[in-house]
A protein has these predicted regions:
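Aromatic- and glycine-rich peptidoglycan recognition patches
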Residues: 122-230
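Sec/Tat signal peptide C-region and signal peptidase I cleavage site
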Residues: 12-18
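N-terminal capping segments
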Residues: 18-81, 189-230
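...with weaker cross-activation on analogous glycine-rich loops/strands in unrelated enzymes
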Residues: 78-155
Length: 230
């Protein structure tokens, strides 16, 4: 009998140990944040000329790319009440402000806003407000930020450096800032660092509340029907 008990203990002990290892593995699995998943998506699109293959529900531009990267169930970067005078960038910025998510510091996965990247109102002046958006990919030791965005018909990587916003390259020839606004008849060309307007984190606070379930409504309807028959 003691032999059987020993074998049973070994078998069940091994099973329990294996089960505990599986449980530990499940517990150790990292949780992927919204910003991490969005950044992974955006990076996978670099080099693409259109978003139409992924979705026809967003505009094929910088705000559409950013929305699509973060899009999940009940999560859209756009507010529910986009105003007639707003573009996608200003609408997203307004929602970020309302949620208290605006920041002056770039972090991987954060939204980055730019102003005056093109002559939106076609008056030749530097007065066009928020006009461009992207997703921060990484922040270098020298302060150079790499971001993913859709510009010029292409999803691409570009750089800016807020410590040296007017410098195209450093002393070693490394690019600090890419060009983001072309030279116009009345304006010079501008580097990305000169046009940064701020950042915004994206987390669960951007997600819309779960809609109320209809079960209670159905019960009420059935109850009313029974009452009516009486």
């Amino acid at each position: 009998m003691w032999v059987g008990a020993l074998v049973s203990a070994l078998v069940w002990g091994g099973a329990a140990e294996a089960a505990s290892k599986v449980t530990a593995t499940k517990k150790a699995r990292p949780v992927v944040q919204l910003s991490e998943r969005a950044l992974w998506r955006a990076k996978s699109w670099v080099g693409m000329t259109t978003l139409a293959k992924m979705s026809s529900a967003v505009t094929d531009d910088c705000s559409g790319m950013t929305r699509l990267a973060f899009q999940q169930r009940r999560l859209d970067l756009l507010p529910d009440d986009v105003l007639p005078e707003e573009n996608g960038v200003t609408a997203i910025h307004r929602k970020a402000r309302a949620l208290g998510m605006l920041s002056d510091t770039p972090t991987p996965g954060a939204l980055v806003f730019f102003q005056n990247t093109f002559d939106r109102n076609r008056d030749g002046l530097f007065n066009d407000g928020l006009t461009h958006i992207g997703i921060v990919e990484r922040v270098g030791a020298d302060g150079t930020v790499t971001f993913v965005h859709k510009s010029g018909g292409l999803v691409k990587r570009s750089r800016f450096n807020l410590l040296q916003p007017e410098a195209r390259k450093d002393a070693k020839g490394h690019v600090l800032n890419d060009w983001l606004r072309r030279k116009g008849k009345k304006t010079r060309g501008y580097l990305a660092g000169e046009l940064v307007a701020g950042f915004a984190a994206v987390d669960e606070r951007w997600r819309s509340p779960e809609p109320p379930r209809l079960a209670s409504a159905k019960l009420t309807v059935k109850g009313d029907a029974r009452t009516a028959r009486r």
